[in-house]
């Protein structure tokens, strides 16, 4: 009986020591060192690369949630556990400032982008001059043009603004395929569901199945800017450190590689 009791005691002691080692080890600590970033869908490729780079250099896990800026901003306003928010326009950051959900002193315009017209890579459409003479209906041939939903998606709002200024909105509006975010609009063209789409130039840069067939004059839409800010109730040291990293030279190189303008 004593032998059995001794074995049980040894097993308990060994398990306890193992637990103590785990909870005090750097590996365990790393599991608790993380930062959660809510970011516009158009930043997916660039931020994923930056996140991987950051994890290699720091004892911190970076978790991303990518979607339309409008969707994410509403989630943050409702208390979603984000540490950092990066929007594809100033409007949705203003929304969070008004809701007192972000640290206004940490707000900074991080990036810039441009707007392009895309087609599937093998499309017979090669070049479109984007002005008031463009016959959208003829170009679409009974199909629809993919855009982020102008009612709430920044890319769609920029697209609407450009089309309005080029006197094309009235013809275009009934022919739109409205997507939940800019990457969804890109996917519609990639999959052949729409012959044309309006996306950011950075989205076109990472897509292998599409080509740019037109570039919207930058005077036809408001500057496409990406502000970043710390989420107020979650402003941890990890969040502040990653925010600084996003504005540093290593991240800048990645953003530029993906075609973003860096401030």
PLM features: what roles do these ranges have?
Residues 29-57, 63-70, 74-80, 87-90, ...:
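Exported/periplasmic ABC-transporter solute-binding proteins
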Residues 2-14:
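Bacterial N-terminal signal peptides that target proteins for export
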Residues 11-24:
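Bacterial N-terminal signal peptides
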